[in-house]
Amino acid sequence: MAGIHLHPHDILDEGMPAILQRLDGMKHVEHLFVEINTIFERNPYPVGDLPHNPIHNMVMGTGTLHINTHTDFPRLSQRVDPTILSGADPLMTIKKATDGGKYKVIPWANILNGDFIGDVEHNQVVDFKGRPQAHWLCPNAPDVAQLWQKTFTALKQNYGYDTFLIDRIRFPDWAGKEVNPAGLFTCFCPHCEKKMVQQGLPVNKIKHRLAALADSLKQGDFETPVTALKEEPLLKAWQLFRQQSVTQLVERLLSDAKQTAGGITLWLDLWPPAYSWILGQNYHELTRYSSTLKHFPYHKLGGGADVQGLINHFAHDSESQERAFTAFKRLFELPYDISYETFKQQGFPIHFVAEQNNKVRQLSQPNTFIYSGIQMWNLPASQLIEAVIAAEESACDSLLYYCYGWATQELFDAIGEHNTPNNNSYNNNTVKK
């Protein structure tokens, strides 16, 4: 039941015969997670070329919608990609190529991050200083649930799919076109503030405390903010509020779609548990509403976080960078005896993969199906297989590769060879179906 992520440009540029031939060679992929709306991300990230794309060396995501909804969005919508307006339809293309075959398509939607239009002002994320966070919608905003209820209903009616992987169901992290740590100190839009007051949270006191912690970070004091975020009851209550906000959005999406579309199934794309809590993601609560999830314990990339971007934003010499990295490891409970210089060269140790997978199992509701995300770009084949084996030996159920368009043929071949019977000693220890 392994899966792989595909982007719209993969389908439009390469064509389905080439894609399916390459996927057939992997020998265990069954689920194709097809992106229906892009984020502002370079493909591939952060540098390099698309290794088998005959049209583009690289593609920059623009936060646009890549499906035909044929639906009216009166208050809030996502800008439709020009390729759709000119007649392309990558999701329909892959549907026609896979219907009735061995591959199952799962549309993959980025919920709160993109190029949105309409009444953005009353739906956007706002930081602790009152600054809007560009291209981010708030889970407590009034029109977000309706936007996605209409989109999922249209997907079910127009394409026939009723199971979706939902991504970017969180508050902003610090990464993006520019490093922006203020994204972590959100959201203080009118809807969040009203809800916090209703729950007895002192909004101004929280904002003042966050401002003080931001000043500490600017002055090179990294330990005070870490201790505060981990231990202070006020900030822990605020983090819980953020987590409840994200969980309640997922609950609303399911209940609204049940009324209009007869019900849908949502799978979750989450950050590894080391980081998920600070972004508003609570595995224990979210898996009450979704029985399948994926997270991405990419050990070579710091678990998917832009660790270097954050460290270098606050620390500008080797001594302060080491102090910042030590504080970072303490905040996110990463007990690795490695220096910042070693991390920059090697990432986290390989056992990060199993540790995070096992923690997901512990945090999630019983019988949750867990995909371990596998980094399938910007690394040699030997390290790819090392990560695959580490995941296979952990508490996950299957693998989800990121991603088709960024992976070299060498990596596809390595996965196929790894999954060839009697080829290696791990074939009897494959991931559970």
Model-predicted regions and their roles:
Residues 10-26, 62-96, 147, 244-252, ...:
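Aromatic- and glycine-enriched glycan-recognition loops and surfaces
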Residues 131-350:
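Polysaccharide-binding and catalytic clefts of secreted carbohydrate-active enzymes
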Residues 17-42, 50, 158-162, 292, ...:
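Catalytic domains of carbohydrate-active enzymes, especially glycoside hydrolases
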Residues 1-15, 377-378:
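Boundary/entry segment of secreted carbohydrate-active catalytic domains
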Residues 31-85:
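Aromatic-lined carbohydrate-binding/catalytic grooves of carbohydrate-active enzymes
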Residues 2-9, 88-89, 106-159, 251:
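Active-site-adjacent "subsite" loops/lids of carbohydrate-active enzymes
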Residues 11-25, 144-154, 275-286, 380-390:
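Short, acidic/polar
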Residues 290, 294-308, 343-419:
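Substrate-binding cleft of secreted/luminal carbohydrate-active enzymes
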